[in-house]
Amino acid sequence: MAGFAELGLSSWLVEQCRQLGLKQPTPVQLGCIPAILEGRDCLGCAKTGSGKTAAFVLPILQKLSEDPYGIFCLVLTPTRELAYQIAEQFRVLGKPLGLKDCIIVGGMDMVAQALELSRKPHVVIATPGRLADHLRSSNTFSIKKIRFLVMDEADRLLEQGCTDFTVDLEAILAAVPARRQTLLFSATLTDTLRELQGLATNQPFFWEAQAPVSTVEQLDQRYLLVPEKVKDAYLVHLIQRFQDEHEDWSIIIFTNTCKTCQILCMMLRKFSFPTVALHSMMKQKERFAALAKFKSSIYRILIATDVASRGLDIPTVQVVINHNTPGLPKIYIHRVGRTARAGRQGQAITLVTQYDIHLVHAIEEQIKKKLEEFSVEEAEVLQILTQVNVVRRECEIKLEAAHFDEKKEINKRKQLILEGKDPDLEAKRKAELAKIKQKNRRFKEKVEETLKRQKAGRAGHKGRPPRTPSGSHSGPVPSQGLV
């Protein structure tokens, strides 16, 4: 099998790979690196955990070393967490170059990001929405001279679903040069990607894994048929079972909404499970902290929406539980790809209700494998059913109370927008009015206090003869007129 040197990579990059413990290139790296070094556009499709990131990072770093300038490469990714993970790969492999990178994602200060962009870093890793915001609002940087445009998890970026990046991508593509290398990488090949393969003009190279299934052999995939209304009781029973049998195992539980994610996290903590949540409603710092705590095994259970289903490399996850059956097979593939990574064993269990049978059939058809049933003792589940339902309701009430003020503020902002007003300007105006009112109130209180003191002083002088200045005479004083 060819090594990294045989792919055409420079000796310093081969040495970096050796130091990282990368001894042999993976199939996607063997297929794509030579084509990228030749200057060809590339579309690579391979299952999760196959080394797709290094397949584009290595050749880009080699080309950068030959002609270093900024901004040399733009990498687009659908999630913030994946952006930071890609940046880490660039930093580690590009350390001998003195590589400068810049991460442009939502939830962070735009002014600081604009300053970083103006310094012309070699590589920009961004989510489409935030980068498009910078392009629309700032002229302190340019991506008109980039050499590489990379779309990681390209199927998610290009699909028109609940998260539609179309408008932002149009703004970005209008700002990049026509003469560039475009690299698309994904774990799933969609119709959109097939169309792009046919439209590419820069000697396009297409590589797809030859494996007949989209999930790895080391992954034990099962389903658990449960009634919709008792799903949470089955989930608690499953986690308790894994915790009793394997205390050191790490578990990821995937949910379909931010609210469900937060409620389940609160509920499992009530049962004393070491749980942390990860979803898009959290502040960016909270998301980083949650991931760090899970990766370092401070918390053994991560409850997440699909922001954690793509690209995140957490090699020590033993179990993935789908709290809901994914609506699309590719979502299932990305979720279960968080376990059984790098040759390790892993288990994936999907909670299936009576309404999800057709979704399971679609998944089985895609992965070319039948899911086996996971058996549990129903009597044990029934014993905790009432307790789980009560705790769940308590958590729902607590969450609603905690977010009441926030929802009220959001509704106010919506109303102002409907009235043609800028919510931020209105808030600023109200703050200024409040300051003026407070200043007037303090002035009024000060005047009233002065008047009271004067009144008290006059009352103390009543009954006393008026004091006569020294050297003056008593008697009427002649009028001096108005001064």
From Swiss-Prot:
InterPro entries membership: DEAD/DEAH_box_helicase_dom, DEAD_box_RNA_helicase, Helicase_ATP-bd, Helicase_C-like, P-loop_NTPase, RNA-helicase_DEAD-box_CS, RNA_helicase_DEAD_Q_motif
Top EC class for this record: hydrolase
UniProt-listed SMART domains: DEXDc, HELICc
Purpose: ATP-dependent RNA helicase that plays a role in various aspects of RNA metabolism including the regulation of mRNA export and the levels of pre-ribosomal RNA. Regulates the stability and synthesis of pre-ribosomal RNA and thereby regulates cell proliferation. Also possesses antiviral activity by recognizing gammaherpesvirus transcripts in the context of lytic reactivation.
UniProt short sequence motif DEAD box, positions renumbered to this chain: 152-155
Protein name in UniProt: Probable ATP-dependent RNA helicase DDX49
GO CC annotation: nucleolus; nucleoplasm; nucleus
Motif (Q motif): 2-30
Record-linked Pfam families: DEAD, Helicase_C
Superkingdom of source: Eukaryota
Segments for region (Disordered): 444-483
Gene field: DDX49
Biased amino acid composition, Basic residues: 453-465
Reactions catalysed according to its record: ATP + H2O = ADP + phosphate + H(+)
Listed GO MF terms: ATP binding; ATP hydrolysis activity; RNA binding; RNA helicase activity
Species of origin: Homo sapiens
